[in-house]
Amino acid sequence: MTDTQNRVAMGYIKGVFGIKGWLKIAANTEYSDSLLDYPEWHLVKDGKTVSVTLEAGKVVNSELQVKFEGINDRDLAFSLRGYTIEIPREAFAPTEEDEYYWTDLVGMTVVNKDHTVLGKVSNLMETGANDVLMIDGEHGQILIPFVSQYIETVDTGSKIITADWGLDY
């Protein structure tokens, strides 16, 4: 697997703040400040990748703001607007048993106990009570709560999720 294939999009640069190179970040993470756990970021736009090192970061009024080493003025910061933020998957903290990163579930094939393919996980959504798998396939979109009552196994090696879910639900 190449370095590019092993990176996960975690958000994007949505704008600048001030005149000293600070950037506003739209994070696609549960907690926006969790991006501050990763000192090295890859910024990607139009096939171009720029590797940057995080110098500082803070959350201001629920908005993540960051400063990169070597980006010291508004013009340089502005040139990074619209770049997608990617982090190497191997930089993620290990998960506990029966705990998964959403990015690891997206793309997995979901089958039911009868081995009928329900489709592939296209996304997940947070409902407050639990996460829900959004599955797209030939049967249309199917939503399955990601709880042990319905999810029997998650095999990350074979990329198959087995669910106790019928086509008539």
UniProtKB/Swiss-Prot annotation:
One cellular component (GO) term of this entry: ribosome
Record localization: Cytoplasm
Protein keywords: Chaperone, Cytoplasm, Ribosome biogenesis, rRNA processing
Keyword rRNA processing: yes
Pfam families listed in its UniProt record: PRC_RimM (PF24986), RimM (PF01782)
Domain PRC barrel: 97-169
S-S bonds: none
UniProt KW rRNA processing keyword: yes
Entry's Gene Ontology molecular function annotations: ribosome binding
Entry's Gene Ontology BP terms: ribosomal small subunit biogenesis; rRNA processing
SUPFAM superfamilies per UniProt: PRC-barrel domain, Translation proteins
InterPro entries tied to this protein: PRC_barrel-like_sf, PRC_RimM, RimM, RimM_N, RimM_N_sf, Transl_B-barrel_sf
PANTHER family in UniProt: RIBOSOME MATURATION FACTOR RIMM
Family, as annotated: Belongs to the RimM family.
Domain topic, free-text comment: The PRC barrel domain binds ribosomal protein uS19.
Function, in words: An accessory protein needed during the final step in the assembly of 30S ribosomal subunit, possibly for assembly of the head region. Essential for efficient processing of 16S rRNA. May be needed both before and after RbfA during the maturation of 16S rRNA. It has affinity for free ribosomal 30S subunits but not for 70S ribosomes.
HAMAP family found in the cross-reference section: Ribosome_mat_RimM
NCBIfam families the UniProt entry points to: 16S_RimM (TIGR02273)
The protein's assembly and partners: Binds ribosomal protein uS19.
Protein name per UniProt: Ribosome maturation factor RimM
Organism: Neisseria meningitidis serogroup C / serotype 2a (strain ATCC 700532 / DSM 15464 / FAM18)
